[in-house]
């Protein structure tokens, strides 16, 4: 099993798809990494040679991925909260940040509905 950036890449997948298991690498970046490392996109991860894996590791190392990227995102959110910006307050309250409506919908961000006390006579 290939290990790149601290992540076990699934051996049955093609190299391009397998690289997307790494946080911070999507399809486009995975394709560019494979092309730069001279690895065929359709080659399965289990069939990659040690030299090819090493070339892929070198190219992945150029990007901010996994733990470093997660930390960077968290620090950016924390900075917004500390500055007291509108976006920071929305993050803090667990509401949508990018201007979406909240009167209806937004259930993913707000969580499950809370039971309201009924005011029946």
Swiss-Prot record:
<comment type="function">
    <text>Located at the top of the head of the 30S subunit, it contacts several helices of the 16S rRNA. In the 70S ribosome it contacts the 23S rRNA (bridge B1a) and protein L5 of the 50S subunit (bridge B1b), connecting the 2 subunits; these bridges are implicated in subunit movement. Contacts the tRNAs in the A and P-sites.</text>
</comment>
<feature type="region of interest" description="Disordered">
    <location>
        <begin position="91"/>
        <end position="121"/>
    </location>
</feature>
<dbReference type="GO" id="GO:0006412">
    <property type="term" value="P:translation"/>
</dbReference>
<dbReference type="GO" id="GO:0019843">
    <property type="term" value="F:rRNA binding"/>
</dbReference>
<dbReference type="GO" id="GO:0015935">
    <property type="term" value="C:small ribosomal subunit"/>
</dbReference>
<dbReference type="GO" id="GO:0003735">
    <property type="term" value="F:structural constituent of ribosome"/>
</dbReference>
<dbReference type="GO" id="GO:0005829">
    <property type="term" value="C:cytosol"/>
</dbReference>
<dbReference type="InterPro" id="IPR019980">
    <property type="entry name" value="Ribosomal_uS13_bac-type"/>
</dbReference>
<dbReference type="Pfam" id="PF00416">
    <property type="entry name" value="Ribosomal_S13"/>
</dbReference>
<keyword id="KW-0699">rRNA-binding</keyword>
<dbReference type="InterPro" id="IPR010979">
    <property type="entry name" value="Ribosomal_uS13-like_H2TH"/>
</dbReference>
<keyword id="KW-0689">Ribosomal protein</keyword>
<dbReference type="GO" id="GO:0000049">
    <property type="term" value="F:tRNA binding"/>
</dbReference>
<comment type="similarity">
    <text>Belongs to the universal ribosomal protein uS13 family.</text>
</comment>
<protein>
    <recommendedName>
        <fullName>Small ribosomal subunit protein uS13</fullName>
    </recommendedName>
</protein>
<keyword id="KW-0820">tRNA-binding</keyword>
<dbReference type="InterPro" id="IPR001892">
    <property type="entry name" value="Ribosomal_uS13"/>
</dbReference>
<dbReference type="InterPro" id="IPR027437">
    <property type="entry name" value="Rbsml_uS13_C"/>
</dbReference>
<comment type="subunit">
    <text>Part of the 30S ribosomal subunit. Forms a loose heterodimer with protein S19. Forms two bridges to the 50S subunit in the 70S ribosome.</text>
</comment>
<keyword id="KW-0687">Ribonucleoprotein</keyword>
<dbReference type="InterPro" id="IPR018269">
    <property type="entry name" value="Ribosomal_uS13_CS"/>
</dbReference>
<keyword id="KW-0694">RNA-binding</keyword>
């Amino acid at each position: 099993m290939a290990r790149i950036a601290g992540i076990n890449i699934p051996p049955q997948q093609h190299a391009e798809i397998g690289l997307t298991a790494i946080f911070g690498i999507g399809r486009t970046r995975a394709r560019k990494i494979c092309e730069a490392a001279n690895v065929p996109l359709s080659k399965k991860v289990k069939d990659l040679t040690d030299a090819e894996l090493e070339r892929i590791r070198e190219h992945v190392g150029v990007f901010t991925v996994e733990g470093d990227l997660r930390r960077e995102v968290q620090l950016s959110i924390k900075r917004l909260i500390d500055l007291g910006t509108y976006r920071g307050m929305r993050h803090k309250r667990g509401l949508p940040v990018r201007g979406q409506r909240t009167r209806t919908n937004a259930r993913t961000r707000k969580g499950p509905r809370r039971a309201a006390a009924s005011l029946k006579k």
